[in-house]
Structure formats: structure tokens, C-alpha cells
């Protein structure tokens, strides 16, 4: 009986539909983050098993920067500096090829205040004392439904 069942399974296996066993969408590897010299960040991603529907990929974060003033002698002002914050988001639409998408998205740093806005005079310079991208998330949607989401976390520049 076991031999007959095994023979039947081997014979019928090629006829069984594989659609019930389709893989779920996933990132092929963990999205990779790059800290760029211009203080922006870039996230590289590669996902598969997305089917044929156009994917909308979004990278978002909350950015926070502390800006200080530097006098003509190169000394940092003893003031606490100026805090600046922004919500950042970058999106792209991609048509999957063989169910796969890959690419990169970049988030720019927040708009920093000008020298005249925070320093005693125009002869001073501004300096970024700290910059962080908080809750960096990459999300893939198809037909307005979330398919994939990866929380990268916080990134300091």
C-alpha cells in the first residue's frame, strides 16, 4: 500500500498546481544603507516574488539636525545651536521584471538655516553639530496595499 501511494504521488506530482505554493514577496537581502558625503543617505534594495503589478517604493524618515555658529577664528559659538527638523520622503514607481525590483532611493538632509538666520553676522559660518535620520523605513506597495516593509532604524551622520 505504501509503495502504491508513493508511486501515485510521484506520478501525479507534476500535475499538482504550484500556484498554492507561490513564494511571498520579500527582500532578497537586507536593504543596504549608504551615508553620503553630502550628508544624505541612500538605501539600496532588491526584492522578488512581486508578480507583475507596478510597485510603489517609498523611503521615509524624520530628520533632526543641530546647527552651530563658527566665528572667523574657527571657534564654535558657546550657544546651544539651532535645531531643525523635517519629515523626509522619496518614492518611485517600478514595473517588476520577472517579479523582481531593485534600485535605490536617497533622502536629503533637512534644509539648514542660513548664517544670517542664526549667527551674529555674515562673517561667521554654520557647522552641522549633529544630524540624525530617525525611523528610516522602506516600504513597497502594490495597488495601495503594503506588500513589504523594512524598518532600518536610526542613522546618524
Residue ranges and their predicted role:
Residues 1-6:
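Bacterial N-terminal signal peptides that target proteins for export
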Amino acid at each position: 500500500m505504501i509503495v502504491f501511494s508513493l508511486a501515485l504521488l510521484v506520478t501525479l506530482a507534476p500535475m499538482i498546481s504550484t500556484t498554492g505554493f507561490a513564494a511571498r514577496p520579500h527582500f532578497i537581502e537586507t536593504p543596504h544603507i549608504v551615508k553620503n558625503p553630502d550628508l544624505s543617505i541612500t538605501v539600496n534594495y532588491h526584492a522578488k516574488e512581486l508578480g507583475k503589478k507596478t510597485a510603489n517604493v517609498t523611503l521615509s524618515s524624520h530628520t533632526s539636525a543641530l546647527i552651530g555658529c563658527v566665528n572667523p577664528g574657527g571657534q564654535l559659538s558657546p550657544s546651544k545651536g539651532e535645531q531643525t527638523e523635517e519629515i523626509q520622503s522619496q518614492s518611485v514607481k517600478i514595473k517588476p521584471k520577472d517579479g523582481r525590483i531593485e534600485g535605490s532611493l536617497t533622502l536629503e538632509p533637512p534644509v539648514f538655516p542660513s548664517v544670517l538666520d542664526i549667527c551674529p553676522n555674515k562673517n561667521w559660518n554654520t557647522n552641522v553639530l549633529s544630524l540624525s535620520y530617525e525611523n528610516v523605513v522602506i516600504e513597497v506597495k502594490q495597488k495601495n496595499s503594503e506588500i513589504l516593509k523594512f524598518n532600518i532604524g536610526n542613522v546618524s551622520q
